[in-house]
Amino acid sequence: TTTVRFESATVPMARLAALFRTLESNHLTPELTDAVAEVWVRLSATRTEMLLGVDLFHRIEQVPFTDLNPEDKPHQELTVENFVRAGVRLGEEDRAHMATIEAELTALSTSFSRALGTDTRELAVHLGEADELKGLSEDQIAAAATRAGERDESGYLLGLNNFTQQLVLGPLESAATREHVLRNSMARGARGGDGDTRAQVSDITALRALQAKLLGYPSYSSYAIDNQTAGGPDAAADIVSSLIAPANAQLAAELD
């Protein structure tokens, strides 16, 4: 009953997080930035307070696993694990430290997203001639023209995806245009100014290392992958390394 009530109480928060994650990824505007940031701060604080709640954890931990069916048992185990990984078994002072770290990480993550969004908008690729877009569909070219018009610019504007490898690189026939797109994509976050993310990345890395240390892990990578299939950073690296030779062989075969 305790776990069911706990899960039910978190449903509205999960739905709100999903909504704002979608909004932030696809429809974030400068006007909405502060409101979205405030929502993330409140959601993070609520989640942290919940997962570091010792009394609530003790009630959930009391649920006997032997009485659960095969579907509920792993769910209960995961619920307990989430509390433990958040730091609920730490002493009072360390729990307070973990809460502070989580609040700082949320603020840094929001700042990072804001800066990345700024640079992504500023580095959208402006092109003057339709020939430079050869290979794209008519709809894509029309969308690029519309995007340029929305900024009161002539020609065409290719927006950038959140990830480095851009979707338009495949169909674009112009090597110069492909180079322009990829160069702008890779430049994000490292040009100085409001769109620079290097300070946030550095601070997030330091805080994650401190977080892992408080929880007894040698590194954040060890903490992050501890409950995953690989089980540890070295094992994960071995898995990735084992793919290199087959990938090179496949590449050589395709280039032959």
What are these regions (language model features)?
Residues 1-256:
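Zn2+-dependent metallopeptidase catalytic domains
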